[in-house]
């Protein structure tokens, strides 16, 4: 039993050396957020990353919690083409849940486990400048990222803090905008030229004929979208991953956040547990 523990540590050692001092952007959502054991394991993983010299930055979602709060307030959520229709009242609720509740819970749990986390949203220091998303028709205050101003993130990580970001952006019109957390995480990772972007999802990664694909290039990932292998909610995640890699991010990992310690298993082991998208070396 003891030698097994030693072997695990030895397997992790080259990765700890390789990633020391590097920035990881992690999108926290899905099963990892809903299952208590997975949520606790996520917090532990982030703390361990931090203590091995990695600089983690968290971007979180919270769609189910927003819908539940709306129902509690007697407002029925409305979706159009899979996107939440966000009028002014809904945007207030989105901001209340993401910034005022979920963000603070993540920060509290990280700090209770030995971290130094600080909660912010895209409006702080104009981190995320947004504009109205019109691709799916008029769905209200749903935004896309126009620009990322990462100076506040540099200031936080240089002072040993773990930034925890709620994906609420600020428009040049002064309005708040609800931004997809995967998209926000990808754009933030690009602005920082992060070593890794890790997307926690509800599935094991990119699948073909029910089997996990461990590694893909951006070109291969796009071909899987074109040929119908990648469908539904996985399409925007793969598109985010491709955009991030082509924008200078070292690699993107799509993993199942419902698996306890999914981040450590993916990053610190030879085999990994999900799909890694990166350019061919050389």
Curated annotation (Swiss-Prot):
> Which Cys-Cys disulphide bridges does the record give?
none
* Reaction(s) catalysed (UniProt annotation): N-acetyl-L-glutamate + ATP = N-acetyl-L-glutamyl 5-phosphate + ADP
Record Gene3D superfamilies:
Acetylglutamate kinase-like
Which residues are L-arginine-binding? 196, 214, 266-269
GO CC terms on record? cytoplasm
The protein's UniProt keywords, in alphabetical order, are:
Allosteric enzyme, Amino-acid biosynthesis, Arginine biosynthesis, ATP-binding, Cytoplasm, Kinase, Nucleotide-binding, Transferase
Regarding activators and inhibitors, the annotation says:
Allosterically inhibited by arginine.
Any one GO MF term held by the record is: acetylglutamate kinase activity
- For substrate, which residues are the binding ones? 62-63, 84, 178
Where does this protein act, in terms of pathway? Answer: Amino-acid biosynthesis; L-arginine biosynthesis; N(2)-acetyl-L-ornithine from L-glutamate: step 2/4
Q: Temperature note from the UniProt entry?
A: Active from 25 to 80 degrees Celsius.
Spell out the residues of the site Transition state stabilizer.
27, 237
An annotated GO BP: L-arginine biosynthetic process
Locations listed in the record: Cytoplasm
Q: How does it assemble?
A: Homohexamer.
Q: Which family does it belong to?
A: Belongs to the acetylglutamate kinase family. ArgB subfamily.
Q: What does this protein do?
A: Catalyzes the ATP-dependent phosphorylation of N-acetyl-L-glutamate.
What is the name attached to this protein's record? Acetylglutamate kinase
The species this protein belongs to is Thermotoga maritima (strain ATCC 43589 / DSM 3109 / JCM 10099 / NBRC 100826 / MSB8)
**Organism classification:** Bacteria, Thermotogati, Thermotogota, Thermotogae, Thermotogales
């Amino acid at each position: 039993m003891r030698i097994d523990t030693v072997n695990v540590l030895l397997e992790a050692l080259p990765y700890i050396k390789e990633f020391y001092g590097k920035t990881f952007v992690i999108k926290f959502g899905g099963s990892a957020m809903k299952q208590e054991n997975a949520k606790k394991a996520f917090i532990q993983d982030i703390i361990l990353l931090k203590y091995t010299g990695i600089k983690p930055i968290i971007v979180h979602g919270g769609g189910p919690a927003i819908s539940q709060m709306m129902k509690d307030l007697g407002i029925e959520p409305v979706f159009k083409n899979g996107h939440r229709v966000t009028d002014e009242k809904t945007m207030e609720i989105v901001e209340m849940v993401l910034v005022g509740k979920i963000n603070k819970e993540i920060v509290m749990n990280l700090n209770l486990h030995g971290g130094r986390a600080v909660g912010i949203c895209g409006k702080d220091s104009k981190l995320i400048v947004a504009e109205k998303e019109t691709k799916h028709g008029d769905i209200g205050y749903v935004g896309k990222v126009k620009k990322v101003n990462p100076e506040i993130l540099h200031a936080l990580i240089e002072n040993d803090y773990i930034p925890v970001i709620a994906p609420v952006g600020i428009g040049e019109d002064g309005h708040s905008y609800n931004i997809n957390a995967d998209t926000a995480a990808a754009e933030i990772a690009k602005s920082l030229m992060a070593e890794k972007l890790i997307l926690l999802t509800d599935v094991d990664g990119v699948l073909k004929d029910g089997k996990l694909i461990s590694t893909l290039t951006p070109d291969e990932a796009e071909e899987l979208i074109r040929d119908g292998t990648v469908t539904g909610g996985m399409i925007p995640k793969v598109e985010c991953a491709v955009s991030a890699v082509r924008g200078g991010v070292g690699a993107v990992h799509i993993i199942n956040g419902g698996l306890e310690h999914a981040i450590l298993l993916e990053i610190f082991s030879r085999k990994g547990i999900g799909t890694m998208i990166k350019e061919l070396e050389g």
